[in-house]
A protein has these predicted regions:
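Nucleic-acid substrate recognition interfaces
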Residues: 1-260
Length: 260
C-alpha cells in the first residue's frame, strides 16, 4: 500500500556473514563502538560518584579528575581560539548583520556541580587524544557519546522525581550501566559513508567497499548507515532519502534485504 512519508525515507539492508571480506572490518567497528560507549559512561560515572560521595576518592575517580585537571587549560585554549576565529569572521560582515559572539570557557566539575556535559567531555577527549574516541570517525564517536548522555539525562530526571515521589518507584533509579556484550551498533553519517557509481558503499578507515548493486539503488540521497551486530552477523542498513512523494510500504512491513 502507499503511505504518506514527508521525509521519504527508504531503508535497505545487507546481511554480512562470516567469510565476507568486510566481516572483520564491521566486527572491529562494532567492538570499538562498545568501547566508546563504555569509556564515555566511565568518565561520567567517575566524576558523578566521586563528587557526590562523602568518603575519600577511589583510585579510578581520582584518575579521571586528574585527567580533567591536566587538560582543562588545553580545552579552554581551543575554546578561545575558536572564539577568536568566529569574532574575526563576524567583523567581516556589515555592522548591522554582525552577531554577538560569546566565549564559553570550561570549568572543572566540583561538589556543587558534580557533572560533565557532552561538550565538556568531547573537548576533553580531543585534548587527551583519547584512544577510543580516535578509533572511530569523529561523528561516530560523538553520536555514541550523545546516546550515553541521553541515558544519564533520563537517570537524573528519574532520580529527581524519585526524591519527590518515591512511592512511584519500586526502588531508587540505578546509575546507567556499562555494555557487557562485546559489540554495539554504530551509526555513520553521509559524510563518513559515500555511495559511488550507485553501486559501491565506501566506509571510513578502510579501502574496502561494499557492493550494494544488488539492492537496486538508483536514486535518492544517502542519509545515514547503521551497522547492527546480530546473531554473529552484521546488518548494514542504508537510510535513503528518496525523491518520490510517496513511499510504497509492504503490508508485512519488511525491509528490502539481501544476504552476502
Amino acid at each position: 500500500m502507499a503511505k504518506e512519508n514527508p521525509s521519504n525515507y527508504k531503508t535497505l539492508q545487507i546481511w554480512i556473514k562470516k567469510g565476507h571480506r568486510m566481516y572483520s572490518y564491521f566486527q572491529e567497528c562494532c567492538h570499538n563502538a562498545k568501547n566508546m560507549y563504555n569509556t564515555t559512561n566511565f568518565y561520567i560515572r567517575q566524576v558523578y560518584t566521586g563528587l557526590t560521595q562523602e568518603k575519600e576518592l577511589q583510585p579510578l575517580q581520582k584518575e579521571v579528575l586528574d585527567h580533567i585537571h591536566k587538560n582543562i587549560g588545553k580545552m579552554n585554549d581551543t575554546q578561545l581560539l575558536a572564539y577568536q576565529k568566529k569574532l574575526e569572521k563576524e567583523k567581516l560582515k556589515p555592522k548591522e548583520e554582525q552577531k554577538e559572539i560569546t566565549c564559553n570557557l570550561f570549568s572543572e566539575p566540583n561538589f556543587e556541580k558534580p557533572y560533565v556535559d557532552y561538550n565538556f567531555l568531547d573537548a576533553l577527549f580531543k585534548a587527551m587524544i583519547q584512544n577510543d574516541y580516535r578509533a572511530l570517525p569523529t561523528q561516530c564517536s560523538q553520536s555514541i557519546m550523545k546516546g550515553v548522555f541521553q541515558n544519564w539525562k533520563s537517570f537524573l530526571a528519574s532520580l529527581k522525581d524519585y526524591k519527590k515521589n518515591p512511592n512511584k518507584y519500586a526502588g531508587m533509579p540505578r546509575i546507567p550501566k556499562y555494555i557487557r556484550s562485546s559489540e554495539k551498533e554504530i551509526l555513520y553519517t553521509n559524510q563518513d559513508c559515500i555511495i559511488k557509481n550507485s553501486r559501491f558503499l565506501k566506509f571510513p578507515k578502510t579501502k574496502l567497499q561494499l557492493n550494494i548493486g544488488k539492492l537496486g539503488f538508483t536514486e535518492g540521497k544517502l542519509k545515514q548507515v547503521r551497522v547492527i551486530p546480530k546473531y554473529n552477523e552484521y546488518v548494514v542498513e542504508l537510510v535513503i532519502d528518496v525523491p518520490s512523494e510517496q513511499q510504497i510500504i509492504e503490508e508485512n512491513a519488511r525491509y528490502m534485504s539481501i544476504d552476502l
